[in-house]
Design a protein with these regions (language model features):
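Signal-peptide-cleaved, periplasmic/extracellular N-terminal interaction regions immediately downstream
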Residues: 1-63
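Active-site-proximal helix/loop segments of hydrolytic enzymes
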Residues: 6, 50-56, 60, 79-296
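Intrinsically disordered, low-complexity segments enriched in small/polar residues
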Residues: 9, 21, 73, 289-292
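Intrinsically disordered, low-complexity acidic/polar segments
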Residues: 13-17, 40-42, 74, 143, ...
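Intrinsic disorder/low-complexity detector
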Residues: 26, 36, 75, 184, ...
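Short, flexible active-site-adjacent loop segments at beta-strand->alpha-helix junctions, enriched
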Residues: 37-39, 69, 155-157
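Short glycine-rich His-centered loop
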Residues: 61-80
Length: 296
């Protein structure tokens, strides 16, 4: 059909309208129109109908944990260990924490000291239809006094790059289950999907930082940052990159290599994931008022 006509029991006007991409257990796009009454009723009030319950997701949320670097790419080096060793140990600890709750399915991009291409890491999450992607890393710097964790989400420039990368494929619209009849409409729907994903990523970043701070884990002063990192480019999977601390700082390296400290850190990350999935869907669709801070 090309049009829909509604007969309203009261005079009204459109207050706002917007498009919701697939998510929260709903596989199709939804066009939402909010109406505001103009005054008194012009006829008998319409019978009140209870809204149908939202479709419930049958499966547990799938969290993909990405242990940064690996194999021929050891990442940054500390006094005792390499970044790839630290990230794999943290990924395995986080997997154990999440599986212990019984509320999640968990998938690792690597489980051993192997090299995995950056774009393959993203493909693993997309192919599995992940609900959340978290990439674990350890920062490095020339000043050994600098320490603290930070969380990265996709920048606006990175979002543009993501769209360009994604639309190189001839059948990109099929990957997002778009109609494929009108390229301009599909592009709008892709942009809407990307925006919703960015909003969800920002929501998780804020929640995660709140839980890290509550656990007394040291944070950088500007702890929420943005960048066009390759592992954040999926247009339809909320994603963050967590720099757990500076491997070049003796105190941070100790926290990252001590088993008890690592388990405590991953428990706070798991708590953040728990809270993220408890947040109402409407909040996740709303753009953050607290955007990522710039670089120091």
């Amino acid at each position: 059909f090309r049009s829909v006509e509604l007969e309203l029991a009261r005079g009204s006007q459109i207050e706002r309208r917007f498009l919701l991409p697939p998510g929260d257990g709903v596989a199709h796009y939804r066009y939402v129109v909010d109406l505001k009454a103009n005054g008194g009723a012009v006829g008998p009030a319409a019978p009140r109908v209870s809204p149908a319950p939202a479709p419930r997701r049958a499966e547990k949320p799938l969290v993909v944990i990405d242990a940064g670097h690996g194999g021929r790419d050891p990442g940054a080096s500390g006094a005792k260990v390499s970044e790839s060793e630290v990230t794999l140990a943290a990924a395995l600890a986080l997997k154990a924490e999440l599986e212990r709750t019984g509320r999640y399915r968990v998938l690792l991009t690597r489980e051993t000291n192997t090299y995995v291409d950056l774009y393959r890491r993203v493909a693993i999450a997309r192919r599995a239809d992940a609900d959340l992607f978290i990439s674990l890393h350890a920062d490095a710097g020339t000043d050994p006094a600098v320490r603290g964790a930070s969380v990265y989400t996709l920048s606006e420039q990175g979002a543009g790059r993501a769209v360009r990368e994604f639309t190189r494929s001839d059948n990109w619209h099929r990957e997002l289950h778009l109609p494929g009849r009108d390229p301009s409409v599909d592009r709008i729907l892709l942009d809407m999907t990307q925006r919703a994903t960015q909003n969800r990523s920002a929501q998780f970043a804020r929640v995660l930082l709140t839980h890290l701070e509550a656990s007394d884990h040291p944070l950088l002063r500007r702890s929420h940052r943005d960048a066009g990192l390759a592992v954040l480019l999926a247009p339809d999977v909320p994603a963050v990159l967590l720099e757990m601390g500076f491997i070049t700082n003796p105190e941070d390296e100790r926290l990252l290599t001590d088993e008890r400290a690592r388990r405590r850190l991953m428990r706070s990350v798991a708590d953040g994931i728990d809270r993220y999935f408890r947040e109402p869907a409407a909040a996740l669709m709303t753009a953050s008022n607290d955007g990522p801070a710039g670089q120091p």
